[in-house]
């Protein structure tokens, strides 16, 4: 559906929010955002196996987690893989090629965000670009957390400003952006 053009790869390497290695600090910042945005039930969306594992280890099961069994294109270590496999959250399985966003992934993300219980989206392929549609689809006050290779975890507070930045990157991807918004259950201006 959408693919990352070679010309944009560098733009996608820049973190969209602050980077930390401390899950407790990240969770405190997420709670602060929920308070500031008057959104006490705003979800936390984790993109990546290692990020999901660290949040769970810190005592916070992500409301939505997207995992692919890999970190930096290598299989995650056994401890992380076993811990995530043992999680009893509802699971959705999707296919999503590298450097892409498939309709299947976008539809699953929309479905998972509407579920009151935690959902793990198991991705065959890669989930690396999933932070963008997560920012676009999540409610105000949510936090989207993803891994920054070699640095730590990035937390993006979902606000009108972060949605604008995500929208610009999302719409710069190659493919049918209108159909991608439809699969995500959103319209380009961010309304549901």
From Swiss-Prot:
Organism annotation: Halorubrum lacusprofundi (strain ATCC 49239 / DSM 5036 / JCM 8891 / ACAM 34)
Residues reported to bind GTP: 49-51, 68, 70, 127
Pfam family, one: DUF359
Task performed by this protein: Catalyzes the GTP-dependent phosphorylation of the 3'-hydroxyl group of dephosphocoenzyme A to form coenzyme A (CoA).
UniProt KW keywords: Coenzyme A biosynthesis, GTP-binding, Kinase, Nucleotide-binding, Transferase
Homology family: Belongs to the GTP-dependent DPCK family.
Keyword Zinc-finger part of the UniProt annotation: no
Domain of life according to the entry: Archaea
UniProt protein name: GTP-dependent dephospho-CoA kinase
GO BP: any one term: coenzyme A biosynthetic process
Pathway(s) it belongs to: Cofactor biosynthesis; coenzyme A biosynthesis
Family matches, as InterPro entries: GTP-dep_dephospho-CoA_kin (IPR007164)
Gene Ontology MF term list: GTP binding; kinase activity
Reactions the enzyme catalyzes: 3'-dephospho-CoA + GTP = GDP + CoA + H(+)
Record EC number: 2.7.1.237
Entry annotated with the keyword Nucleotide-binding: yes
